[in-house]
């Protein structure tokens, strides 16, 4: 907060996040790597719905490793410097399901269509299955071994929470297909 004349501390920021979640329950809220790990953990518990990890903010940052002494082209300072894999593992340790889902946008479930599914509580028939399938893709393609092990446990546990038996069966089949190399399934 000291870097800006109107900066706020983490406690005020957390209160703002909580107020937004109560006032606008269906809105998406994203927390960036600008915030510390501790701040990010706190606001996740208060209703942040998306979190970044392994962010690079300098030109070419994803192509070439950023050197600690050569960060002059950064767009902003990154406080949480953990890798994406570390953030994914941390989220699972906290009891969250890391999801890389973009299905609603890709299927045109935005605006009124999305809100209708949310208010009727039907979005759950899409979100949990899509979260598990995209997590499985991440585990197969990018995860460190310990993250893979943790992720497989999360998937096995969370499959039980898919209420619709038919949907659960489809997800189980698709998870096997993902393990066999197929990608891009979505509900």
Report the location of each language-model feature:
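Alpha-helix N-cap and loop-to-helix initiation/capping positions
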Residues: 5-12, 75, 79
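Conserved C-terminal portion of the radical SAM core fold
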Residues: 1-2, 9-38, 45, 50, ...
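Radical SAM enzyme core and accessory elements
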Residues: 41, 46-49, 55-187
């Amino acid at each position: 907060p000291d870097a800006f004349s109107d900066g706020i501390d983490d406690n005020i920021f957390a209160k703002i996040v909580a107020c937004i979640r109560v006032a606008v329950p269906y809105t998406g809220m994203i927390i960036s790597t600008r915030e510390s790990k501790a701040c990010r953990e706190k606001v996740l518990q208060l209703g942040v719905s998306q979190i970044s990890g392994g962010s690079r903010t300098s030109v070419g940052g994803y192509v070439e490793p950023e050197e600690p002494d050569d960060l002059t082209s950064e767009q902003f300072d990154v406080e949480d410097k953990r890798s994406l894999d570390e953030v994914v593992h941390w989220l699972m340790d906290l009891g969250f399901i890391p999801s890389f889902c973009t299905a609603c946008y890709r299927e045109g479930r935005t605006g009124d269509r999305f809100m209708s599914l949310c208010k009727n509580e039907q979005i759950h028939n899409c979100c949990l299955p899509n979260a598990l399938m995209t997590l499985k893709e991440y585990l197969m393609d990018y995860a460190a071994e310990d993250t893979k092990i943790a992720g497989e446990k999360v998937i096995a546990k969370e499959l039980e929470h898919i209420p619709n038996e038919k949907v659960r069966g489809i997800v189980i089949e698709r998870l096997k297909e993902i393990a066999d190399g197929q990608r891009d399934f979505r509900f």
